[in-house]
């Protein structure tokens, strides 16, 4: 016999379907963001490794829907930067930075020459016959790109290097005059903990941190969790590859 909860759920679904809608369970991380932004507008968002702003991007919908998000999208690959400019050309609240975030303290970068660069390992733009997601593969760590050999057997022949502008996280945040960062998101193919560690250099700790852990070693991932827990964050895995952290 169906439970009362099951009966109520089906009844509610039928009601909304009649009006052309459907009910979808919102992921916990999204509920946390939605609740926070109601009382914190503008909401300050920094995304490191924005790629093209669409593919596998959990925050694209937020940016499209919400004019209250003051955002900095940081991306080192030129073709992706061009795409970001095209998508958000009419959005003054969204800034695009053609740069990579280096390792080490952002405070050091504040006094470093603007000509600092980072060596980026990426799949060549001229590569043919590869999966559609291959152009997302760009990292400061060559071994992370090469590790996709199980799905792209000849990936070694397509790996190339590119020198890209390199800045510190705090340097970029300061450049755009953000008084704080509410959400820091990073997806940099294995370089993510190096970026997360730079939250100590920001004006205050971000309320939320969302980072890709899939390409971190078990030791690095453990260290990243300890780092966040020591700063009073609660953490949980969003899926098999990402972690969401929220200040207590």
Give the ranges of each region predicted by the language model:
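Phosphate/nucleotide-binding beta-alpha loop and adjacent structural elements of enzyme active sites
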Residues: 1-248
């Amino acid at each position: 016999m169906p439970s009362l909860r099951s009966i109520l759920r089906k009844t509610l679904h039928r009601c909304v379907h009649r009006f052309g809608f459907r009910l979808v369970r919102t992921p916990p991380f999204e509920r946390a963001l939605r609740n926070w932004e109601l009382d914190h507008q503008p909401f300050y968002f920094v995304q490191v490794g924005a790629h093209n702003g669409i593919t596998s991007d959990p925050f694209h919908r937020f940016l499209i829907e919400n004019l209250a998000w003051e955002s900095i999208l940081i991306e080192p690959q030129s073709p992706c930067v061009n795409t970001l400019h095209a998508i958000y050309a009419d959005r003054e609240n969204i800034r695009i930075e053609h740069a990579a975030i280096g390792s080490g303290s952002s405070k050091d970068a504040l006094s470093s020459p603007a000509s600092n660069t980072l060596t980026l390992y990426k799949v060549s733009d001229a590569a043919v016959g590869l999966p559609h997601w291959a152009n997302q593969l760009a990292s400061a760590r060559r071994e992370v790109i090469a590790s996709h050999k199980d799905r792209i057997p000849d990936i070694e022949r397509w790996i190339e290097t590119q020198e890209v502008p390199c800045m510190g996280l705090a340097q970029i945040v300061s450049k755009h005059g953000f008084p704080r960062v509410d959400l820091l998101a990073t997806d940099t193919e294995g370089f993510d903990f190096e970026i997360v560690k730079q939250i100590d250099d920001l004006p205050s700790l971000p309320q939320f941190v969302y980072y890709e852990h899939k390409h971190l070693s078990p030791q690095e991932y453990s260290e990243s969790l300890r780092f966040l827990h020591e700063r009073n964050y609660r953490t949980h895995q969003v899926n098999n590859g990402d972690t969401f952290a929220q200040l207590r």
